[in-house]
Regions:
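Residue in the alpha/beta-hydrolase core beta-strand immediately N-terminal to the catalytic nucleophile
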Residues: 44, 82, 104-106
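Conserved acidic catalytic loop of the alpha/beta-hydrolase fold
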Residues: 63-81
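Conserved serine/cysteine hydrolase catalytic core
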Residues: 179-225, 234
Length: 283
C-alpha cells in the first residue's frame, strides 16, 4: 500500500503520525517550527486523508495499521527514523519503537493506556457523536467552520482552543473525519491495550494534554507505570490534539524527544537543541 505523505525540511528524519479520524495536515502548525532542524515526513494513515482504504485482511486492526506504517518506512528507505504520533499515531509510534524501527519515540496522548474499559467506551461514544454530528451537518459544515462558535461545536472534544483552528483547517478536518469513518469503525471495534516492551536504549517521551477530554489525563499515570524509563511530560492547557492548542510547546517536545541521548552516550551530550526554549517540566 502506497500511503500519501508530505516530506519537507532538513535534518534527521522525523515521521509524524496523526490520530484516528484525522489527516497528515494535523501537523501543519508545528511544521514551520521544526523544518529547519528535522526532515519531516507527515503521512496519512491507511483509510485516512488521501491514502488508500484500510483493509486489515483478517489481521487485528491496530497491528495491521502498524504493519502498513512499517512497510511505508521500508518504501522510503527509513531504517530507524525518529517517530512521533498523536493518539492512535502515538500508539503506532510506540509499536514501531517496540519492534526496533524507531530511533526515538514521542507519543502525544497515545492510545492504549486505559485505566479501565469504561474509558474506552467513553471515547468510542464521543467518536460516535462526532460521526453522527458530521453526517448531519455536511451541508452546513463550511458555514460552521467559518464561525468561532461553530468550530467550538465541532472540535471541543479534541482541542482546548478551537478558535485557533482556521476555517480552512476546520472544514478540512471535518471532511477528513467523514472520509475515515470505515477505518475509524475498524480501529474502535475493540480497545487497544499497549503492553509491548520497548528496549531502554530507545528514548521514549510521553506527553499528555492536561485538558484532554478524549483520552483522559489519568491515562498518563498508566503510561508512566507501563513505560517507567520514558520521559513523561504534561502539556499544560492542551486538549487531545495539542498541535494547534500550543504549537510552540509541541514543537519543543518533538524536537527534544528526537534528540534525547541513548544510555550509552556521555551525559555531557544531553542538551536541548539550540533553538529550543526551556523544556516543559517533567512530572
Amino acid at each position: 500500500m502506497t500511503l500519501a505523505y508530505d516530506r519537507v525540511g532538513s535534518g534527521p528524519p522525523l515521521v509524524l503520525l496523526h490520530g484516528v479520524g484525522h489527516r497528515r495536515q494535523a501537523w501543519t502548525a508545528v511544521v514551520p517550527r521544526l523544518r529547519d532542524q528535522r526532515e519531516l515526513i507527515m503521512v496519512d494513515l491507511p483509510g485516512h486523508g488521501e491514502s488508500p482504504p484500510f483493509q486489515p485482511g483478517g489481521r487485528e486492526p491496530v497491528q495491521a495499521m502498524a504493519e502498513e506504517v512499517i512497510a511505508f518506512l521500508d518504501e522510503l528507505g527509513l531504517e530507524r527514523p525518529h517517530v512521533a504520533g498523536n493518539s492512535l499515531g502515538g500508539a503506532l509510534a510506540l509499536i514501531a519503537g517496540s519492534e526496533g524501527r524507531a530511533a526515538t519515540v514521542t507519543g502525544l496522548s497515545p492510545a492504549g493506556f486505559w485505566v479501565h474499559r469504561r474509558q474506552f467506551s467513553y471515547a468510542k461514544a464521543i467518536f460516535k457523536v462526532m460521526e453522527v454530528t458530521g453526517a448531519g451537518i455536511q451541508g452546513s459544515a463550511p458555514r460552521l467552520a467559518r464561525s468561532t462558535t461553530g468550530r467550538a461545536l465541532l472540535f471541543a472534544a479534541v482541542v482546548s482552543r478551537p478558535s485557533r483552528l482556521s476555517a480552512e483547517q476546520a472544514l478540512g478536518d471535518t471532511q477528513a473525519f467523514m472520509i475515515a469513518r470505515p477505518a475509524v469503525d475498524l480501529i474502535l471495534a475493540n480497545p487497544l491495550w499497549f503492553t509491548a516492551p520497548i528496549e531502554e536504549q530507545v528514548p521514549v517521551t510521553i506527553a499528555w494534554g492536561t485538558k484532554d477530554r478524549l483520552l483522559l489525563p489519568s491515562q498518563a499515570d498508566v503510561a508512566r507505570r507501563q513505560l517507567p524509563h520514558a520521559r513523561h511530560l504534561p502539556l499544560p492547557g492542551c486538549g487531545h490534539v495539542p498541535m494547534t492548542d500550543d504549537p510552540d510547546l509541541v514543537a519543543r517536545v518533538l524536537l527534544d524527544g528526537s534528540t534525547l541521548p541513548t544510555p550509552t552516550e556521555p551525559a555531557a551530550t544531553a542538551e536541548p537543541a539550540e533553538s529550543a526554549p526551556d523544556r516543559p517540566a517533567e512530572r
